[in-house]
Amino acid sequence: METKVIAINRRSANITEGKSRAPNRSMYYAMGYEESDFKKPMIGVANGHSTITPCNSGLQKLADAAIDAIEEAGGNAQVFGTPTISDGMAMGTEGMKYSLVSREVISDCIETCVQGQWMDGVLVVGGCDKNMPGGLMGMLRANVPAIFVYGGTILPGHYQGKDLNIVSVFEAVGENAAGRMSDEDLLQIERRAIPGTGSCGGMYTANTMSSAFEALGISLPYSSTMANPHDEKLNSAKESARVLIEAVKKDIKPRDIVTKKSIENAVAVIMATGGSTNAVLHFLAIAHAAGVEWTIDDFERVRQKTPVLCNLKPSGQYLAVDLHQAGGIPQVMKMLLVAGLLHGDCITISGQTIAEVLADVPDAPRAGQDVIRPIDQPMYAQGHLAILKGNLSPEGCVAKITGLKNPVMTGPARVFEDEQSGLKAILDGKIVAGDVMVLRYLGPKGGPGMPEMLAPTGALIGAGLGESVGLITDGRFSGGTWGMVVGHVAPEAAAGGNIAFIEEGDSITIDANQLLLQLNISDAELESRKVGWTAPAPRYTRGVQAKFAFNASSASKGAVLDDY
């Protein structure tokens, strides 16, 4: 990509230059600006710091470091806030329905502030799951030079010689309910699982999306697997600010970086690292914001040619900090590049291509570690996020299929209209091996907000039923989920999807080998059940949930709000 040097304040000049803008400049003077500052670029800092969650409570120091570096590099830092929801805290409650909504609110905040204030560039600092897709969607809509600074991963907790993370606690609840763990051990795991700041430590949603941002080239190399408490994270934030100022000078914008080829790169890295099912939903939305043609079937295309190289939780053994020590995302990317599974000509925020960024990275992982496998000895020959279709999900749904002893099951439906009743049935011992749980009316419109469900899946794992009980839903799963689970079923129940017409005891087949999700009744029987069906009344009639339910597209299109 050829870059050209431009006036670095060309956007902000709209509100700072000329006699008619004297009132505007007066307001800047009130904040300590000098006349010379108006020739400098106005750089937004979208600060996701919050004391709501440890994922974001360590962000202020990164924002401060970036602000200082922006000023030192000749820019004016303009700080504004973006909200967050703690998925880990909201999980299993009505609050979880606000998680996906927050993705849209974050993107709206960034687009609104950047465009409303004529900013010349923006640096986004985020931590918890929806901060990443929401941040990038806002960056793409505004389409000014931009970079994402990830808050960093959390360090592991420890108990009885084992590493712990937030998923350990959810699974411990299930073990305790099944009589396999004492109350004292549950309490100790609860207290020790999260020792400090940073995002949840496995290849869960936050680390999945931040790793994908490295692969896109919208974040700096190695930044996604750094731990929040470590000094290198501060240094990375400073370097991100310096790189952004250069991108403003060269006019490198998000839509130059986020293309179909770079999304393929990101999805290849998601597959290679064993990332979260949520990445499917979020990259459909990111592609929409970028104006890139990308469908749910493209994930399956990339999956079939990309091996799983990393032995990472939830279905593997290690955490993001271990991946960092083993060479980080650049090592994984270099292996994929050498194997012809990555596009090396994609541009990054630094102005370098992916191939140039990876030039000095070894072709193969170092010996003596088991986090990153050699390309010819992968964890699995194909990716783990499979797109299933069938009469229960003609638009597609997402299953995490690696690590399962038997990726095929047929069993009787156990139908629940909400998450809480399904969780109670598990904890009360009413779900048995061979059952297929159906949790419905939890999609983008029906939830509304398409809540994640780590509590039921964690309870199944803890009860020893993770591979013997199936669970399908039009809602989502946490990045920490594993087992025989299928989410994002589309069309959703609230839109009249066939998941709405499953009856208790119906036979359901989940077949990851054949990429099939099937309700085993005749077409005639299925059609007869639809007679007289009407959509349920909205659960919310005012506020953000009502707006989300009214506007949200299908999960197969990313559950976006502007698919008009």
UniProtKB/Swiss-Prot annotation:
<dbReference type="Pfam" id="PF00920">
    <property type="entry name" value="ILVD_EDD_N"/>
</dbReference>
<feature type="binding site">
    <location>
        <position position="87"/>
    </location>
    <ligand>
        <name>Mg(2+)</name>
    </ligand>
</feature>
<keyword id="KW-0456">Lyase</keyword>
<feature type="modified residue" description="N6-carboxylysine">
    <location>
        <position position="130"/>
    </location>
</feature>
<keyword id="KW-0411">Iron-sulfur</keyword>
<dbReference type="InterPro" id="IPR037237">
    <property type="entry name" value="IlvD/EDD_N"/>
</dbReference>
<dbReference type="InterPro" id="IPR004404">
    <property type="entry name" value="DihydroxyA_deHydtase"/>
</dbReference>
<feature type="binding site">
    <location>
        <position position="452"/>
    </location>
    <ligand>
        <name>Mg(2+)</name>
    </ligand>
</feature>
<keyword id="KW-0460">Magnesium</keyword>
<keyword id="KW-0479">Metal-binding</keyword>
<keyword id="KW-0100">Branched-chain amino acid biosynthesis</keyword>
<feature type="active site" description="Proton acceptor">
    <location>
        <position position="478"/>
    </location>
</feature>
<feature type="binding site">
    <location>
        <position position="128"/>
    </location>
    <ligand>
        <name>[2Fe-2S] cluster</name>
    </ligand>
</feature>
<comment type="pathway">
    <text>Amino-acid biosynthesis; L-isoleucine biosynthesis; L-isoleucine from 2-oxobutanoate: step 3/4.</text>
</comment>
<dbReference type="GO" id="GO:0009099">
    <property type="term" value="P:L-valine biosynthetic process"/>
</dbReference>
<dbReference type="InterPro" id="IPR020558">
    <property type="entry name" value="DiOHA_6PGluconate_deHydtase_CS"/>
</dbReference>
<comment type="pathway">
    <text>Amino-acid biosynthesis; L-valine biosynthesis; L-valine from pyruvate: step 3/4.</text>
</comment>
<protein>
    <recommendedName>
        <fullName>Dihydroxy-acid dehydratase</fullName>
        <ecNumber>4.2.1.9</ecNumber>
    </recommendedName>
</protein>
<keyword id="KW-0028">Amino-acid biosynthesis</keyword>
<dbReference type="InterPro" id="IPR056740">
    <property type="entry name" value="ILV_EDD_C"/>
</dbReference>
<keyword id="KW-0001">2Fe-2S</keyword>
<comment type="function">
    <text>Functions in the biosynthesis of branched-chain amino acids. Catalyzes the dehydration of (2R,3R)-2,3-dihydroxy-3-methylpentanoate (2,3-dihydroxy-3-methylvalerate) into 2-oxo-3-methylpentanoate (2-oxo-3-methylvalerate) and of (2R)-2,3-dihydroxy-3-methylbutanoate (2,3-dihydroxyisovalerate) into 2-oxo-3-methylbutanoate (2-oxoisovalerate), the penultimate precursor to L-isoleucine and L-valine, respectively.</text>
</comment>
<dbReference type="InterPro" id="IPR050165">
    <property type="entry name" value="DHAD_IlvD/Edd"/>
</dbReference>
<comment type="similarity">
    <text>Belongs to the IlvD/Edd family.</text>
</comment>
<dbReference type="GO" id="GO:0051537">
    <property type="term" value="F:2 iron, 2 sulfur cluster binding"/>
</dbReference>
<feature type="binding site">
    <location>
        <position position="129"/>
    </location>
    <ligand>
        <name>Mg(2+)</name>
    </ligand>
</feature>
<dbReference type="GO" id="GO:0000287">
    <property type="term" value="F:magnesium ion binding"/>
</dbReference>
<dbReference type="GO" id="GO:0004160">
    <property type="term" value="F:dihydroxy-acid dehydratase activity"/>
</dbReference>
<keyword id="KW-0408">Iron</keyword>
<dbReference type="GO" id="GO:0009097">
    <property type="term" value="P:isoleucine biosynthetic process"/>
</dbReference>
<dbReference type="InterPro" id="IPR042096">
    <property type="entry name" value="Dihydro-acid_dehy_C"/>
</dbReference>
<feature type="binding site">
    <location>
        <position position="55"/>
    </location>
    <ligand>
        <name>[2Fe-2S] cluster</name>
    </ligand>
</feature>
<feature type="binding site">
    <location>
        <position position="200"/>
    </location>
    <ligand>
        <name>[2Fe-2S] cluster</name>
    </ligand>
</feature>
<dbReference type="InterPro" id="IPR000581">
    <property type="entry name" value="ILV_EDD_N"/>
</dbReference>
<comment type="subunit">
    <text>Homodimer.</text>
</comment>
<feature type="binding site" description="via carbamate group">
    <location>
        <position position="130"/>
    </location>
    <ligand>
        <name>Mg(2+)</name>
    </ligand>
</feature>
<dbReference type="Pfam" id="PF24877">
    <property type="entry name" value="ILV_EDD_C"/>
</dbReference>
